């Protein structure tokens, strides 16, 4: 299978590339920006004309800095998607990586179902672009277009300075205090599960073209840190700025499970154990000064 992964140098794309390459029947295309600039129509046209692509996994997005996207994020994200749509072969499947932010952050409710989509329109540029792409896929009725709506996702290769679970593990490993703005309940999907889900939809055509990609069990931020500290044999301690709970970020996965045929997710504790082992084996990746800046906490203060 000839598979193009856009954004293959990012957290999700890098994991997908590593996972799918294990199947020797797959030929993975992971071009650099110089080889393929999806915001440039000529670049996209030439790439698709010169390469036989059977599947596109679109994980590329406009890069953010400390969780802040540039002003033209919506324009760039739409250009990338539209250029893929225009220049891919009509029989080439496109698996687009969507986001729970399509439901509009200020209006999130627990266990959002797919039919909740379009009740509200997202206000920020990144979420709005994801919303519009999802809308295009839904309205197209094209069976080659698939939108996988991701909520929380974690695993190796993610940015430990602003991704909660890796941030928590890294700080605990080097003895830094854990401080959160407010407790929140999340759907955290392990990257290994996501890779298996994508592989399933390459091998098996989905019944639904858009679905939430979330685990069955949700978890709150305090419980995650408690488990990490218990595993590392650290006295449980976490500082919380605001009492109560922030806005829950969870989605209903009924449609996903119908398409996956009784898929069993990796238990959250098992996946955290694996990530702890990864950081223990790669302690050199952890930059104490970057963790002390605490960009993740500053971002959390702004959104909750």
Q: Which residues are covered by each model-predicted region?
A:
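N-terminal Rossmann NAD(P)H-binding glycine-rich loop of SDR-like oxidoreductase domains
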Residues: 2-21
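Glycine-rich Rossmann NAD(P)(H)-binding loop
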Residues: 6, 153-157, 179-188, 210-219, ...
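NAD(P)H-binding glycine-rich loop region in Rossmannoid oxidoreductase-like domains
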Residues: 38-76
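NAD(P)-cofactor binding segment of oxidoreductase domains
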Residues: 54, 68-95
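Conserved Rossmann-fold NAD(P)-dependent oxidoreductase catalytic core, especially the SDR/UDP-sugar
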Residues: 82-123
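NAD(P)-dependent short-chain dehydrogenase/reductase
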Residues: 131, 135-186, 191-200, 227-231
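Mid/C-terminal beta-alpha module of Rossmann-like enzyme folds, strongest
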Residues: 168, 197, 204-244, 248, ...
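Amphipathic terminal alpha-helices
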Residues: 268-304
